[in-house]
Amino acid sequence: MAAAKAEMQLMSPLQISDPFGSFPHSPTMDNYPKLEEMMLSNGAPQFLGAAGAPEGSSGSSSGSSGGGGGGGGGSSSSNSNSSSAFNPQGEASEQPYEHLTAESFPDISLNNEKVLVETSYPSQTTRLPPITYTGRFSLEPAPNSGNTLWPEPLFSLVSGLVSMTNPPATSSSASSPAASSSASQSPPLSCAVQSNDSSPIYSAAPTFPTPNTDIFPEPQGQAFPGSAGPALQYPPPAYPGAKGGFQVPMIPDYLFPQQQGDLGLGTPDQKPFQGLESRTQQPSLTPLSTIKAFATQSGSQDLKALNSTYQSQLIKPSRMRKYPNRPSKTPPHERPYACPVESCDRRFSRSDELTRHIRIHTGQKPQCRISMRNFSRSDHLTTHIRTHTGEKPFACDICGRKFARSDERKRHTKIHLRQKDKKADKSAASAATSSLPSYPSPVATSYPSPATTSYPSPATTSYPSPVPTSYSSPGSSTYPSPVHNGFPSPSVATTYSSVPPAFPTQVSSFPSSAVTNSFSASTGLSDMTTTFSPRTIEIC
């Protein structure tokens, strides 16, 4: 413990290294060989001198000790191994320190073995900016420190740096007795840091496997307070929360460029329609359930080609309407679905109509994954898929024939309607032909029959029979002399001769009334016979 107190008194502002210089993967590790070279060039002769040098002489010198951020350096006065504190190569040798254990502070002190330290920079003479800090610190082993890479005292050191107030920044020579008074009895750390470098302490994150935010419970939401001069400032979200200051390499953002489009994280100059395009960018492909037979044939290369094709498609410039001011048939309040493109004022009453219209702007066409055909409408793709699957959901109600498309069934139904109309025309024609023979029969049969049958018979039968019989019988037998010699002969001749001319005139003038003519003729003959030949009736 006395050796640790002596080392704290020997430190000067130009010889104190970065408190975080020994941290693994720290940015200050790149400058550590320069610091060690400076320390060896300035303070090595004092540590390589006589073994029994007094403690006061080493305190007045400006040599450096081996305790950078850890503070556990080599003693130069009271033990026999003080002459071997630094070997000729400039590396610190191992010395027994009972108050520091290897479990709690293994790789921080310069007395331990350094793997990353190289002293092959003789030409570089640039010095680090001077860092001055005052205060006291204590390193005690943590009881439950299972992680040897990040012991608990170091995190208490970081917590003390963040939660400090504004103490006056003085030189270390003025406060060195206070720092060495009770180094092992005061666990808390109060330290002021002043530097001309405005870069943060941690510019890169340590790559430990499972980062835990409980390691830094206090620094969240705090910043380094400013002190006199250009103080070291830090952004408000401290270690776990800040993205630029404390980057934990868990899942880099550059591995997920496509998720930014899905979340709408685009540039401000993009159109509002870009988000909608990214939402509907995936092509409308054939459902996998309908192409089970083709699943083994179509590999992932086709899908990758499709995705790359549609990812490379850009929004086409929107077409202006031919008549933008022409009113639509449907009022606007009944068309709630408006096109999201800025220069397009189309509105639709149905969402599927809007989706179909958006494909005009995006150029997206649903594609069949079996035949790789593109279609302008998704319903056309659905109909096309049925040609591969053999599905025919539309059946004819008359004959039961099935079709894959509804318009095919409608076209087929028209065939049945035409056949039905033809059958109706044929049945009407057959009914008309069956009613025609019953209607014209009275005209063609009943009317000509009296003219041909009943009319000639009285003229040939009833008329000649009384004339020759009644005339010849009295003339030849009964009245031979009066017929040729008396008065009845001229009257009979004149009367009989006048009857035939009157009868043809009646027949010619009244051809339709054949019955009446025959009756009148018979009546005239009967009167003539009864008048001129009374015996005719008896003979007949």
Curated annotation (Swiss-Prot):
It is found in: Nucleus; Cytoplasm. SMART domains: ZnF_C2H2. InterPro entries: EGR1_C, EGR_N, Znf_C2H2_sf, Znf_C2H2_type. The record marks 335, 346, 350, 356, 373, 377, 401, 405, 411 as: Interaction with DNA. Residues 192-201 have a biased composition (Polar residues). Its main location: nucleus. There is a cross-link at residue 304 (Glycyl lysine isopeptide (Lys-Gly) (interchain with G-Cter in SUMO2)). Residues 167-190, 427-482 have a biased composition (Low complexity). GO terms for cellular component: cytoplasm; nucleoplasm; nucleus. GO terms for molecular function: DNA-binding transcription factor activity, RNA polymerase II-specific; double-stranded methylated DNA binding; hemi-methylated DNA-binding; promoter-specific chromatin binding; RNA polymerase II cis-regulatory region sequence-specific DNA binding; sequence-specific DNA binding; zinc ion binding. Keywords: Activator, Biological rhythms, Cytoplasm, DNA-binding, Isopeptide bond, Metal-binding, Nucleus, Repeat, Transcription, Transcription regulation, Ubl conjugation, Zinc, Zinc-finger. Residues 64-75 have a biased composition (Gly residues). Residues 1-105, 162-240, 317-337, 407-482 are annotated as: Disordered. Binds to DNA motifs with the sequence 5'-GCG(T/G)GGGCG-3' via its C2H2-type zinc fingers. The first, most N-terminal zinc finger binds to the 3'-GCG motif, the middle zinc finger interacts with the central TGG motif, and the C-terminal zinc finger binds to the 5'-GCG motif. Binds double-stranded target DNA, irrespective of the cytosine methylation status. Has reduced affinity for target DNA where the cytosines have been oxidized to 5-hydroxymethylcytosine. Does not bind target DNA where the cytosines have been oxidized to 5-formylcytosine or 5-carboxylcytosine. Interacts with SNAI1 and SP1 upon 12-O-tetradecanoylphorbol-13-acetate (TPA) induction. PANTHER family: EARLY GROWTH RESPONSE PROTEIN 1 (PTHR23235:SF42), KRUEPPEL-LIKE TRANSCRIPTION FACTOR (PTHR23235). Belongs to the EGR C2H2-type zinc-finger protein family. Transcriptional regulator. Recognizes and binds to the DNA sequence 5'-GCG(T/G)GGGCG-3'(EGR-site) in the promoter region of target genes. Binds double-stranded target DNA, irrespective of the cytosine methylation status. Regulates the transcription of numerous target genes, and thereby plays an important role in regulating the response to growth factors, DNA damage, and ischemia. Plays a role in the regulation of cell survival, proliferation and cell death. Activates expression of p53/TP53 and TGFB1, and thereby helps prevent tumor formation. This is Early growth response protein 1. It comes from Bos taurus. The lineage of its organism: Eukaryota, Metazoa, Chordata, Craniata, Vertebrata.
